[in-house]
């Protein structure tokens, strides 16, 4: 029976007393931080709604006007290898073309498929620029149905490797799997992103047709400046590494000291490595920021290498100028106008309701007490007044 009443040892005492789970007596831990809790009333809500509508309306209109000034040409050449003629230029089906110019286009874009002695195919695009376009001119490729934002895909590279460090095979980031090694050699650069790099080749000259002069383009400074610092020249020996599987067409005999890619200066690679957030995206490949594009007829030659049929997507050639917020994008301006319209609509509804069906008790003047009411209140709460009398 004695064991039933045996007590355990008490917690050790300290100078501050026994151990306690009480939170520290601070404003944050005790939830005493200062806060602002505004009282929503017609006098405060209506001006706010009207203010937002007045601000968002001109912003939305400005964004739409800026977007409409952007001139662009988009040609989907995904089916050039199957639908284009190999003998003469033919009109491209209308569903593969989209353009916005200040002047009317008289001649429809055309395409033709060519093949050299090595079996390499090229898609030749001819198109008309109906009016002079002021600088700057940008050439993008557009990909659809490609989910670069997949978690495994986004993480599939080795940070130290792209910084130029000669990482050993066993030390490579596991996220590079299954593109880590082949034939007991390290894949450089490893990972799914590098392996799936877009490799259609655009000519760096818009060849003028008839009396139109050639228009030169460049692939310099097409990547973000911060990206150019992320990629460094590798310290690997060419004999210790192999290219990714999908690069074998470009490097059929593997790497040598002469053809080893320098990702520090290879800006097309840097552009591709910055993954897109949506399955439809544009990536810059060429540009000219020094000269305007004269009106006339031009030809762009594209060497076909990228197999979009593997993921059921499309690839397009995009020639465009830029506006205040980039390319031709009406969505942002429309969203601003929608918000402005909703604010104006709710403001009108609240105003009409306030006029025809006011809420009297919502007036703040009812929170003030005059002297007579204070005296009555003090009388009711006198010391000798019982609870029964108050009720």
From Swiss-Prot:
* Reported effect, residue 80 to A: Reduces interaction with DRS2
Topology: which residues are Lumenal? Answer: 66-331
Segments of this protein annotated with the region Disordered: 1-25
Glycosylation: residue positions: 199, 216, 237, 288, 329
Top-level taxon? Eukaryota
Chain ranges sitting on the Cytoplasmic side read 1-44, 353-391
Specify where the region named Confers specificity for binding DRS2 lies, as residue ranges.
68-329
What does changing residue 123 to A do? Reduces interaction with DRS2
Cellular component, GO annotation? Cdc50p-Drs2p complex; cytosol; endoplasmic reticulum; Golgi apparatus; late endosome membrane; phospholipid-translocating ATPase complex; plasma membrane; trans-Golgi network
Q: Which UniProt keywords apply?
A: Disulfide bond, Endosome, Glycoprotein, Golgi apparatus, Membrane, Transmembrane, Transmembrane helix
Q: Where in the cell is it found?
A: Golgi apparatus, trans-Golgi network membrane; Late endosome membrane
Q: What happens when the gene is disrupted?
A: Leads to abnormal trafficking of DRS2 from the endoplasmic reticulum to the Golgi, and decreases DRS2 protein level. Abnormal processing and modification of proteins in the trans-Golgi network. Accumulation of aberrant membranous material probably derived from the Golgi. Sensitive to cold, papuamide B (lipopeptide that permeabilizes phosphatidylserine-containing membranes), and Ro09-0198 (antifungal peptide that targets phosphatidylethanolamine in the outer leaflet of the cell membrane).
Q: Outcome of altering residue 320 to A?
A: Abnormal endocytic recycling, but interaction with DRS2 appears normal
User: Which one GO biological process term can you cite for this protein?
Assistant: endocytosis
How is the protein disposed in the membrane? Multi-pass membrane protein
Q: Its family? A: Belongs to the CDC50/LEM3 family.
Purpose: Accessory component of a P4-ATPase flippase complex which catalyzes the hydrolysis of ATP coupled to the transport of phosphatidylserine and small amounts of ethanolamine from the lumen to the cytosolic leaflet of the trans-Golgi network and ensures the maintenance of asymmetric distribution of phospholipids. Required for the formation of transport vesicles from endosomes.
Please give the name of this protein: Phospholipid-transporting ATPase accessory subunit CDC50
Please state the gene responsible for encoding this protein.
CDC50
């Amino acid at each position: 029976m004695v064991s039933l009443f045996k007590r355990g040892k008490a917690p050790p005492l300290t100078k501050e007393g026994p151990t306690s789970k009480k939170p520290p007596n601070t404003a944050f831990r005790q939830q005493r931080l200062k806060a602002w809790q505004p009282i929503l009333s017609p006098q405060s809500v209506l001006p706010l709604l009207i203010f937002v509508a007045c601000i968002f309306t001109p912003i939305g209109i400005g964004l739409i006007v800026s977007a409409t000034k952007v001139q662009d040409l988009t040609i989907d050449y995904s089916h050039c290898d199957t639908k284009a003629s190999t003998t003469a230029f033919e009109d491209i089906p209308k569903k593969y073309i989209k353009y916005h110019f200040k002047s009317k286009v008289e001649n429809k874009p055309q395409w033709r498929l060519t093949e050299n002695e090595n079996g390499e195919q090229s898609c030749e695009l001819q198109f008309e620029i109906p009016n002079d376009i002021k600088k700057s001119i940008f050439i993008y490729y557009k990909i659809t149905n490609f989910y670069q934002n997949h978690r495994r895909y986004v993480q599939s590279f080795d940070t130290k490797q792209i910084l130029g460090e000669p990482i050993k095979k066993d030390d490579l980031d596991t996220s590079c799997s299954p593109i880590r090694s082949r034939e007991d050699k390290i894949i450089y650069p490893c990972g799914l992103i590098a392996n799936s790099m877009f490799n259609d080749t655009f000519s760096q000259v818009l060849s003028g047709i008839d009396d139109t002069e050639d228009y030169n383009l460049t692939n310099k400074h097409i990547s973000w400046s911060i990206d150019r610092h992320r990629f460094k020249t590798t310290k690997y020996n060419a004999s210790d590494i192999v290219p990714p599987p999908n690069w074998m067409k470009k490097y059929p005999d593997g790497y040598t000291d002469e053809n080893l890619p320098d990702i520090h200066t290879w800006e097309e690679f840097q552009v591709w490595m910055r993954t897109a957030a949506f399955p439809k995206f544009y990536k810059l490949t060429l540009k000219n920021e020094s000269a305007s594009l004269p009106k006339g007829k031009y030809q762009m030659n594209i060497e076909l290498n990228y197999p979009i049929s593997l993921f059921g997507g499309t690839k397009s050639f995009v020639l465009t100028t830029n506006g205040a917020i980039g390319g031709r994008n009406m969505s942002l301006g429309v969203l601003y106008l929608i918000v402005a319209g909703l604010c104006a609509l709710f403001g009108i509804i609240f105003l009409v309701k306030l006029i025809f069906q006011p809420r009297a008790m919502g007036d703040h003047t009812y929170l003030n007490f005059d002297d007579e009411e204070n005296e009555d209140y003090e009388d009711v709460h006198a010391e000798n007044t019982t609870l029964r009398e108050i009720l």
